[in-house]
Design a protein with these regions (language model features):
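Conserved HGGG/HGGXW glycine-rich cap/lid loop of the alpha/beta-hydrolase fold
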Residues: 9-60
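Acidic beta-to-alpha connecting loop that harbors the catalytic carboxylate
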Residues: 29, 224-226, 250-252
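Conserved acidic catalytic loop of the alpha/beta-hydrolase fold
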Residues: 70-88
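Conserved hydrolase catalytic core segment
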Residues: 85-128
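Alpha/beta-hydrolase
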Residues: 129-210
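Short beta-strand/loop motif that positions the catalytic acidic residue
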Residues: 214, 220-222
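Conserved alpha/beta-hydrolase "acid-adjacent" motif
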Residues: 226-232
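Catalytic active-site module of serine/aspartate enzymes centered on a nucleophile-bearing elbow/loop
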Residues: 240-273
Length: 273
């Protein structure tokens, strides 16, 4: 599904068929709205509605010179189009800063924040512009993208190649969702290059919002075996005014979300309800 924003750009989105408090999901990198589909069963169990969209440059969402704050504005416009006033927000991995940016910019609309497997903000920016950083990363990214070959119309083969690039524990949990979901995720994540490269470039420099401006209750979720996210967790808990930390035993990066969906949604749904 897609919507047209006021400036003419397209946002591709997905909504669960459930009813209840809305949880707005910000995907990781390389990732898409389809990661929210892995929480569909948990949404039914808990009684919440999931809403997720592809950031600019992913899938059919129009590329633009986006930042964390502009993506938060896109999310607010999407909610306006749906007539949704208040939401809980969930950010997976690189989506964590985007979810926090929304919570900081729209405190009156945000009931709770979940930051899952998210990185910390760097202290200093590298030399050059965001576009310079994107250009530097492009050759390595394009070589990796070429190995996955997102233009392959065989979902089974595409899903297999994408899963092979993930940590074994993450791939084992994602594979059962099927080639349609996984292959579609890989295609939307990689068919265009701007989304991934811009996400990576933005992650390498200080963000254009202050995490300390988040006013809602927040939970930082990390996996015990996700070393980078575990190391970043204190950065988040020390800056978010109302933060709790949850460490999922024996889980890696994506596995933290996939195994903790019910617990995450219960906490968000309670705050939203």
């Amino acid at each position: 599904m897609k919507v047209s924003l006021a400036d003419g750009r397209i946002l591709r989105y997905w909504s669960s068929a459930t009813t209840g408090p809305v949880v707005l999901v910000f995907h990781g990198c390389p990732d898409t709205r389809r990661v929210a589909m892995t929480g569909d069963a948990a949404a039914h169990e808990v009684g919440v509605r999931l809403l997720a969209f592809n950031r600019p440059g992913y899938g059919s969402s129009t590329p633009t010179d986006s930042t964390h704050t502009t993506v938060a504005r896109d999310a607010a416009e999407l909610l306006d189009l749906w007539g949704i006033e208040r939401v809980a927000v969930l950010g997976m991995s690189v989506g964590g800063p985007y979810a926090a940016a929304f919570a900081a910019a729209y405190p009156h609309r945000t009931t709770a924040l979940a930051v899952v497997s998210a990185p910390a903000m760097p202290r200093e920016a590298p030399e050059g512009t965001i576009e310079d950083a994107m250009a530097r990363m492009a050759p390595e990214f394009l070589a990796w993208r070429g190995r996955i070959d997102p233009d392959d119309e065989d979902d089974e083969a595409l899903a297999a190649r994408f899963l092979a690039e993930l940590p074994e524990a993450d791939a084992a949990l994602l594979a059962p969702y099927g080639a349609d979901l996984v292959g579609g995720l890989a295609w939307e994540a990689l068919v265009e290059t701007d989304g991934y490269l811009r996400d990576a470039a933005l992650l390498m420099r200080p963000w254009d919002f202050d995490v300390a401006d988040v006013r809602c209750p927040a939970t930082v979720w990390v996996g015990e075996d996700d070393a980078k996210a575990l190391a970043a967790a204190p950065w988040w808990t020390n800056r978010l005014p109302q933060a709790a930390l949850e460490v999922a035993p024996g889980t890696t990066h994506l596995a933290t979300l996939l195994t903790q969906w019910p617990a995450i949604l219960r906490r968000l749904g309670t705050a939203t309800g």
